[in-house]
Curated annotation (Swiss-Prot):
Classification via HAMAP family: RNApol_bact_RpoZ
Name of the featured protein: DNA-directed RNA polymerase subunit omega
Pfam families linked to this entry: RNA_pol_Rpb6
Functional note: Promotes RNA polymerase assembly. Latches the N- and C-terminal regions of the beta' subunit thereby facilitating its interaction with the beta and alpha subunits.
Subunit text: The RNAP catalytic core consists of 2 alpha, 1 beta, 1 beta' and 1 omega subunit. When a sigma factor is associated with the core the holoenzyme is formed, which can initiate transcription.
Length: 70
């Protein structure tokens, strides 16, 4: 699947909130960079951590929760 389609699906999975998606991708990419295992089966040497994070969100492997301020 093309990266544009993956990004569109990931955006849909976070309620079309680009800010939320960018924060989630950055946090997950940081986790992957520090040694966490990817939740999708990909060659980590072939893809960037941000691309893997997008794939995980697009496939619904990561659940993004928004903390509500009181």
């Amino acid at each position: 699947m093309r990266l544009e389609k993956i990004a569109a699906k990931a955006l849909e999975n976070v309620g079309f909130d680009r800010y939320l998606l960018s924060i989630a991708v950055a946090k997950r990419a940081n986790e992957l960079a520090t040694g966490k295992e990817p939740l999708v089966e990909v060659d980590v040497k072939k893809y960037k951590y941000t691309d893997i994070a997008l794939m995980e969100i697009a496939e619904g492997k990561l659940k993004i929760e928004v903390e509500k301020e009181s």
